Amino acid sequence: MESQRMTWLYDRHHSLKHNKAERQAILSTYRLAKRPNLSSEGMIGESCIVRTNCFSVHLESLDDQTIYEYDVCVTPEVGINRAVIRELVKQQKDSGLGGRLPAYDGRKRLYTSGPLPFDSHRFLVLLDSIEDSPEESRHLRVRDFVVTLKFAAKISLWTLRKFRGGKPNRESRAALRALDVVLKELPTARYTQFAGSFYSPNLGECRQLCKVLESWRGFHQRIQATQMGLQLNIDVSSSVFIKPVPVVDYVAQLLNEDILLDRPLCSTEFLKIKEALEGLKVQINGILFNTYHVQDLVHQAASFPVNFSIQYPSLPCLKVAHFGETIFLPLEVCKIAEGQCHQKQLNAKHMAALLQVARQPPNERDYNILQTVHQNKYQEDPHAKEFGIKIEEKLVSIKSRILPAPWLKFHDSGETTEFLPQLGIWNMMHKKMINGGRVKSWACVNFCWSVREYAARNFCYDLGFMCRESGMVFSVKPVLPLVIAKPGCVESALRTLHDDVMDILRPQGRKLDLLIVILPNNNGSLYGDVKRICETDIGLISQCCLAKHVLKMNKWYLASVALKINAKMGGRNTVLVDALEMRLPHVRDTPTIVFGAHVTHPHPGKANSSSIAAVVASQDWPEVTKYAGLISVQACHQESIQGLFKVQDDPERGTTTSGMIKEHLMSFYRATKRKPGRIIFYRDGVSKGQLPQALMHELGAIKMACASMGPDYNPLVTYVVLQKCRHTRLFADYYNANTHDSTANIRAGTVVDSNICQPNQFDFYLCSHRSTQGTKRPRYYHVLWDENDFLAGSFQELTNYLCYTSATCTQSISVVAPVHYARLLSSRARCYIKPRSIGDSTSHTSLPSEEDSSAASETGSLLPIKDNLKGAMFFC
């Protein structure tokens, strides 16, 4: 019955794609997985107390307190609504607003602690100045604004008790949203807001990343309902801001050179500058009261009268919008407006500098969070007082457990055959891979001129020796002598090498097993080109190595590369002892397939690109260590995975079904000779607002794929969403050595499934990894659908165990292995996008824009992986 219900919902979802009301009705029928009985919690692992960056929120009168919501309309709309509302409050608080101090969300909602003396009213606001921009205030083009306030709803704070009772509804969520707006009112007026966080050069030390970029300190705050009641989550953060420098200096930094007077920009430079400047705000030098939004970069004469001598006439102009008009400004007369966050992708050097600033050890982050709370002075916040909100200024202590690490099995020929990792780490010393792969034919190509021929040969020899020592079969001699090639000739070099190799191997009925590729340290797009050609054109498994590692000859690096090569060649590095002995929770009793899914979206500034979905699935049982991966392309920022299940009408074969889920189920059957009776689907990266839609679409696709494999085939499905807790931190008890490691971080395996979790849903926080830098960030697992009726403790144990099965390293990782592989594969798939022609200045790839909607998957712009690689873990 449940399967039929899900199938119906899936069909209805597609037929009602454009009917919002009926779609909401369908979503309301979903019943998310409930929290298992308390008796199942706290049974596994060592109990301990940790602290989290949450602060208790108290309301003066929860039972009879009401918040009033009003719709806001500001006319004309010129982008300064907050300034207009602040002026309205200043002018009308004691008269027209009845003494109320409202909180405004910056868009359409305004909240008050009591009723205003009207249901609907229009105010005329004369805006003489803008507090945070006095220079702009003196030159306002529009001074008179009409603000219309209209009563919308009464929000009873009593409904917040429904969160504690495990029955949240629309009213309780509205109350939570209103309180969040109230507490953000003061920081919004004080600081620069970006992506939900507040930044200021005065909140901490500003670090210069380069001549035009600097990092600002900031903080994030959000009120949330937990089992402990209302909590204010506060975390410190860092972000990159652009200095208010001349645009020509900004452009010169982008190009990493000074702009020459008579040198026009080439097409590549033009596109790079265009991408960087689009969307920014600029001002004219010496005329700071006007701010212009950059729409485009064009080769057109200036259309704005400026009294400047033009030094660089060959440079393009900025196309900007100004009070409904389009004008063109020369680059050299403009400067970057102050307080703009750098939203484009950072290069490796700038990213490393930012990470150095952002990484704070636990005790330092703990201190900075408390300092932020003290600096915000919530007890003196007039809006908090108005609404009767009080904040405790100490971190909340919560219950946690430290889950045990799993025993790992290695090959019996090694000195150590079983090993229990300590603090989430181990190594391959005195151990051998449990199943060694075979590399009987290999070759090496060197694209780095600084790596001499003898150094490259020695590296390949040492790498082969390490592979053999670790348990692999690795041929001593390559098929061909070392090939030296130029980075600019990557495609011809790889094709020629492959042709020469196959001339030797084809008569023997063999193929090239592995290609070792030596790359320069700063190789730009070379890595992506190598992977694209090898995996979508030739059908080769490759292992890329940077020159700095080749020249160092570090045995730990060689051991790490050997692990990756073994996984790519179909071997296993290690296996869980519990899996071999049929003791792995929720896997031992029935054939189980474990999925990992991830969608990667384009970087900011590349809106014309598409999103890429990757789905990997285990191909062995009960070991759950080998995975196969599939990819699909979909519309830009489309969150739900569109390629899970497809129905096609074939004129010859009739209606056929396909999709990534069905293909994985069939490959699992071919590998194990069994149909999986249980499906565990770990879905990475779905935002909270998209959870119902993702569940409806993707769970329906899974059910439909299973139904297409036979009328009686209905495996039990557990659908788990994994979210990166960007702002939830856990701090150890520094006085209890059993709760932290040598870096003062909480120990690997720390799990929290109470206190700060949701009252009625099946969720938990898990820190499965060891961190050597900064403060650990736990991962949040939310079981949305559970037909297997898992117990909380045993499912947490399984999830923790899966973090020890990654083939790419000898330590537990921060997410379950299938999700880690899905992330690697989706990132790799970015390399498969067809190169964009230079003459096309409208986008950065040949993929369709968002306006093309789902047609993106029909364009074929994502090059397909060669069939001989689909069953291999080539993406490691």
Curated annotation (Swiss-Prot):
Residues covered by the Piwi domain: 514-834
One GO-annotated biological process of the protein: regulatory ncRNA-mediated gene silencing
One Pfam family from the record: Piwi
Alphabetized GO MF terms: RNA binding; RNA endonuclease activity
Record key words, sorted: RNA-mediated gene silencing
Residue stretches in coiled coil: none
One cellular-component annotation, GO: nucleus
Every PAZ domain range: 246-338
PANTHER family listed in its UniProt record: EUKARYOTIC TRANSLATION INITIATION FACTOR 2C
Family stated for the protein in its record: Belongs to the argonaute family. Ago subfamily.
Protein name in the entry: Protein argonaute 17
Top-level taxonomy: Eukaryota, Viridiplantae, Streptophyta, Embryophyta, Tracheophyta
Name of the gene this protein is made from: AGO17
